[in-house]
A protein has these predicted regions:
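Class I S-adenosyl-L-methionine-dependent methyltransferase catalytic core
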Residues: 1-183
Length: 183
């Protein structure tokens, strides 16, 4: 696993061991970031795993990323990857589940330019996260949510509007923005 583009292009990333982890394939990651064109501001990498999506965003110019994963080993891998690339100052890393993390973020009154959702497949975790992101108004007015999920899953987009949807074999990605009725 590696960084695809930007300041840290081709740098290797440590990944998680085990059957329950599923790192984002390079072609999916490249497709996501090519469709975004540019990244900037503040990002949230929820269900971060190895941190590959948030680190890719930092490499491509995002100012800061908050990484969240409930797995202790994942948090250690994220911290190691950030340290290796000297990105610690541009990041915050938390061991927490998505529900509690989103509630804590809401209390900090933070809004994000980009939110990456790449949870374990087929657990309805994206639906729960999108519901809270909408309820807590965590996405900036022109922000984008990037969801990666199994093509077997049906995603409830709540108040968000679909910008683009891509299919990569068994993986689908969805880019969402605030709907017009959220103004």
């Amino acid at each position: 696993m590696r960084v695809i583009a930007g300041k840290h292009k081709s740098k290797p990333l440590e990944s998680l061991e085990g059957r329950n982890t599923r790192p984002t394939m390079d072609k999916v990651k490249e497709g996501i970031f090519n469709s975004l064109h540019e990244v900037y501001g503040l990002g949230l990498d929820l269900f971060a795993g190895s941190g590959a999506l948030g680190i890719e965003a930092l490499s491509r110019g995002m100012d800061k990323v908050i990484f969240v994963d409930q797995n202790f080993k994942a948090v250690k891998v994220i911290q190691a990857n950030l340290k290796q690339l000297n990105l610690e100052e541009q990041s915050e890393v938390y061991k927490n589940n998505a529900d509690r993390a989103l509630k804590a973020i809401n209390k900090r009154d933070i809004q994000f330019d980009f939110i990456f959702l790449d949870p374990p497949y087929n657990k309805e975790l994206i639906d729960k996260a999108l519901d809270q992101i909408s309820k807590f108004n965590l996405l900036k007015e022109h922000g984008i949510i990037i969801c990666e999920f199994s093509n077997q899953e049906k995603i409830n987009t709540y108040d968000f509007e679909v910008i683009k949807q891509y299919h990569y074999g068994l993986t689908d990605t969805l880019l969402l923005k605030k709907g017009d009725h959220n103004d």
